[in-house]
């Protein structure tokens, strides 16, 4: 894997985890909004490769530890799904969002779950930002050595 590939992977991860942070922030912001349905980010691997395919492609000589001739590229943000759990029914007959029986649904957002998910996404974002900075400094050193 080259330096530029690591920067590309880091940039892709920054975009992905930034979107995760945005989704969790919107969930937390709408925790008191009636009928709001929690959104869940969906991430998938960029390549779906089976173990056997990877094993067959490994370069494994007598003295080596085994390496792959390519990088898979990490994960990609593929969309958002709505949490199917229902919020609590609350009787509010005059509320504009009330149904025919006078009930509204509270949001199904759990603040602790979304805060924990947002913190994990933030830490992943920070780790990938460090990857980009380190790759950038490695590229600068390589150019400096080449002079």
Regions from the PLM with identified roles:
Residues 1-147:
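Amphipathic alpha-helical polymerization modules
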